[in-house]
């Protein structure tokens, strides 16, 4: 799920600091010497689109979609869905090209929420594209992920939007999990994450924006965090499961019979497949919510007719 291009001042980064970040001194501050491969593989829950993967495969060598979408690396899943060794090679070529072009800090491609999404996607899809790659590619990749994770630790609080902060922290959490961070370190990250979840959601589980697409994106982030935590043996059930279940109930409330969200507050652009696979991964089923008093929605049905009201 790709975040849309956003304009305006979304994070605090002064011009002088932007200049400093283009120096070798800043590059040195991010340097580390990670292992040539990730020490822990975090399984991926999401499917890509084979049709989009086919478009990437048949496009020119320098294929790009819009810059923000490309920088998030959702397209790696699309190539994986297309399948085959050629798609795997194409993914490596595009990843390596991005690393070569963005190895040094850039305000756009290194924006914390964009970077958090990218790091998470690189880690989640790692087991598909990386293990059979040449050793020099694997070493370059892990260095790049480690540098970005260190930068995320610095920059996530600079984002003004708290939902964007959660996406950035998700990338940091997934990245640290993949590098074998100790449980205490991961638990400390969860201590930062969980209060933010409460700050951006209402008592009934709805996102404060009341926008279904943003609500679903946050829910997917939380599922990914829970996935990464459980894969490292950290129990998040008491903290995350209740919130995810609440958010899923709101999602079911918004859906028409065809599976699409009611077109409230900019909704209707989310793929039905993304909605369905997200709800399928919740791991819980429940009755369709009839009213969400804090979020301000109500649903009622009679026979084959359903009315969903804002």
Describe each model-derived feature in a short phrase.
Residues 1-64:
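Extreme N-terminal leader/anchor segments
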Residues 29, 34-56, 85, 151, ...:
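Preference for long, amphipathic alpha-helical scaffolds in soluble/luminal domains
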